[in-house]
Amino acid sequence: MTMSLPTRYLGTIALTLALGAVFYIGTFLYQIGALVSAEYWIYDAQVVKHELLARNQDKNKLIFAAGSSAFFGIDSQRVEQALGMPTINLGLHIGRPVHFLLNEMTPYLKRGDVVVLPLEYEHYRATTPYSEWFTNQVMAWYPEYFWQLETTEKLRFLRSVLPQRVLLGVLAKLMGD
């Protein structure tokens, strides 16, 4: 049985697209964790804040979770002195989506804890949790976040990453980070 010209043409297009998708996904996965330009200080600060959460896990505590407005605008020590309750400020950067903020603190919460979310305007108007800034940070210094996502969320994440960023990560890996 001979295939008609349009069928062969469409088959060739479908095969090319499938091979292109497999190649792109492979390069995307290869470059995750590449040492590219990113805000690594946020990772370091996040580790410290998680240690504070763990240290106060069994106590009733007050937690502020937001972006840099909380980071720069809320003095945890003063709040703690005024209220007599351990206070932890998880504020770091506006680019961290709300679901990320919530997932970050949830393992450390217990009944009686108070969480305050003084969110920035951008948190309310974001159309996707995967901004260019956020995906770059995750791929550079927090690949565990990507790997723990459900498959459909991994695909949403992958679709939100610019091809130029994938290329940058591949080049960094090939050059030995």
Task: Explain the meaning of each model-derived region.
Residues D44-R55, T135-Y142, D177:
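Short N-terminal signal/transit or membrane-insertion segments
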Residues K49, K59-K61, K110, K154, ...:
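Context-gated lysine
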Residues L19-N89, H93-N103:
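Membrane/wall-proximal cationic-aromatic binding patches
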Residues A65, S69-T152:
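Membrane-embedded segments
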Residues M1-L19:
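N-terminal Sec-pathway targeting helices
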Residues Q148-D177:
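Extended, charge-rich helix/loop segments that form flexible
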